[in-house]
């Protein structure tokens, strides 16, 4: 009787180990996977791609909205890199989306400072300067309605406390 109990206990342990293996599959890595491009930085299928002020911008349409992936390089600052191309002292766009990677510092004309660190949903009001914090590029997935973003998203037209 003791032998049959030992056999039953051994079968139970093996069955439990098999269930555990099925519940937590091992990740398989291959040499090919190791050289893959990071999906946050890979080209977006079907998007229009352009660079402006050192920012890599990819834009696609989703109904009436545009979906944009913006990659800001380490060292980027709006007032240095974009101001000459845009011609305004501050960024006058509203930004609504998801900060997928990196950290950004936002400063408004009234001196108010906001910092965002990934992963985070962001809503940045018009009238700001901003820059990348640290040595990692910033990746933002943004939704906009071209010149109608503020109204369509319910954002204020200027920074408020």
Tell where the protein language model's regions lie, with residue ranges.
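Conserved GNAT-family N-acetyltransferase fold
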Residues: 70-72, 97, 122
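A short, N-terminal "cap"/entry segment at the start of jelly-roll beta-barrel domains
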Residues: 2-71, 76-80, 155-161
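Short acidic-glycine-tyrosine-enriched beta hairpin
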Residues: 108-127
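Short beta-strand segments in beta-sandwich/barrel cores
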Residues: 77-78, 102-107, 130
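Short beta-strand segments
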Residues: 68, 112-114, 139
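Short, conserved beta-strand element in jelly-roll/cupin
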Residues: 88-106
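Catalytic core of non-heme Fe(II) oxygenases with the double-stranded beta-helix
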Residues: 77-91
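Ligand-binding loop in jelly-roll beta-barrel domains
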Residues: 125-150
């Amino acid at each position: 009787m003791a032998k049959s109990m030992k056999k039953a206990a051994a079968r139970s342990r093996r069955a439990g180990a098999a269930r555990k293996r099925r519940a937590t599959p091992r990740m398989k890595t291959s040499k090919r996977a190791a050289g893959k491009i990071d999906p946050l930085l890979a080209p977006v299928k079907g998007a229009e791609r352009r660079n402006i002020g050192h920012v890599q911008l990819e834009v696609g349409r989703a109904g009436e909205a545009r979906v944009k992936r913006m990659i800001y390089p380490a060292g980027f600052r709006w007032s240095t890199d974009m101001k000459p191309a845009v011609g305004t002292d501050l960024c006058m766009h509203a930004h609504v989306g998801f900060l997928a990677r990196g950290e950004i510092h936002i400063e408004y004309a009234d001196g108010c400072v906001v910092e965002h660190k990934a992963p985070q949903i962001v809503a940045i009001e018009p009238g700001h300067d901003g820059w990348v914090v640290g040595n990692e590029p910033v990746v933002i997935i943004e939704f906009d309605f071209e010149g109608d973003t503020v109204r369509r998203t319910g954002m204020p037209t200027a920074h408020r406390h």
